[in-house]
Amino acid sequence: MGRHSCCFKQKLRKGLWSPEEDEKLLNYITRHGHGCWSSVPKLAGLQRCGKSCRLRWINYLRPDLKRGAFSQDEESLIIELHAALGNRWSQIATRLPGRTDNEIKNFWNSCLKKKLRRKGIDPTTHKPLITNELQSLNVIDQKLTSSEVVKSTGSINNLHDQSMVVSSQQGPWWFPANTTTTNQNSAFCFSSSNTTTVSDQIVSLISSMSTSSSPTPMTSNFSPAPNNWEQLNYCNTVPSQSNSIYSAFFGNQYTEASQTMNNNNPLVDQHHHHQDMKSWASEILHYTEHNQSSETVIEAEVKPDIANYYWRSASSSSSPNQEAATLLHDANVEVYGKNLQKLNNMVFDQSL
């Protein structure tokens, strides 16, 4: 509570009232009435402010004040008025004659609140504490469940986003890009992305077979991409052109050896491979002895067969790359004949 301006200008007393001050104030108000409270201290001969005189008269010196404890009727009336008006103590004091607002407030805070709580009534809402506690617990449970639902949905969305990010980062799972050891038939699988021709691959295969005496795994720089899936299936299901050519000239022994190498069996014996090379050489020598009339006749007999075979296989297998088939039919016939002629001469020289 703020003080009047006169309290700062004049040297006024503060604190407890003495009995002499109470007597002076009581005699003045009994004779003249209180009138204007700001002029009462000066007229009564008190070194107090008007507000202090008013509160002292209303709360302590007034003759109609009730002294002593509150009755049961007054307690019930205070509870009813507090339920209707709340903490408006001055309005409650007007309904209780002889009681001050300060006295009623002190009695409420010190006594009536505790009585209501012992009876199971909330002193603020004047309702049973059980229902209020249950409602508060329900509100708390609703808040907790809503927060848990929000957290669970957020965690599910995060997991879904992480799985989508991981799947997008991994990409399509076809084959490892750094695979170096592949099947022999994969060396003859041609597509639009592979720039090397089939003829170069066959020449490298023939040179490696003629120069090396030990079996080595066939390596290729061809790395299959997802768009080469059909070409890979085609090469794995349809018999290879190289297998058909060499089986036509060298017999079934080459086919069996190629199947063994396609299975990638690490237990292939070097001795068996050497015997297979000798059998192939004997077959080639037998073939050249029956056709020693002229080398041109061999080329004339071999080239149409090779060309026709490749043309039939390219047209029947429905390869997606028609340009490679046309190039195989037009430009690579002479290369195959020359390579076979070199191979025949090499085997013939080794036999001598």
Swiss-Prot record:
Keyword annotations of the record: Activator, DNA-binding, Nucleus, Repeat, Transcription, Transcription regulation
Domain HTH myb-type, chain residue ranges per copy: 9-61, 62-116
Annotated SUPFAM superfamilies: Homeodomain-like
Record's subcellular location: Nucleus
GO-annotated molecular function: transcription cis-regulatory region binding
Coiled coil: none
GO cellular component, as recorded: nucleus
Pfam families associated with the record: Myb_DNA-binding
Principal localisation: nucleus
Tissue expression profile of the protein: Expressed in stems, flowers and seeds. Weakly expressed in leaves and roots.
Protein's UniProt keywords contain Repeat: yes
Segments of the chain annotated as binding DNA: 37-61, 89-112
Biological role stated in the UniProt entry: Probable transcription factor.
PANTHER family, A to Z: MYB DOMAIN PROTEIN 55, TRANSCRIPTION FACTOR MYB86
Protein name: Transcription factor MYB86
Gene source species: Arabidopsis thaliana
The encoding gene: MYB86
